[in-house]
Amino acid sequence: MNLRINIFYTTCGSPKQSKKLAKAMLSDKMIVCVNVVKNVESYYRDSGSLKKSNESILLIKTFHTKKKIENLIKKNHPYDIPFLVQLETKKVNSEYILWARKNT
């Protein structure tokens, strides 16, 4: 049995946006689960000046490929240019994999 699952990391500007994006992904049965970490401070440079934003982090668990998740994120994400990265996993416990496959 393949004990791998894909994990993607992205951010949203508000808990409301995060909830909407999570529901869209779950409704499409594209993901197993999404963890939302609220109230993260992000610092960055935009248009030549320093910015600070409060964001939520989304950790997305799925069996789908980056291309499929990327298309779904682009379609539903509130940002014009969302950040999305795939985190490599080595081995996930088999009980979780069985549960995840049964529920997606």
Predicted regions and their residues:
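Positively charged, small/polar-rich N-terminal and surface patches that mediate targeting and assembly
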Residues: 1-104
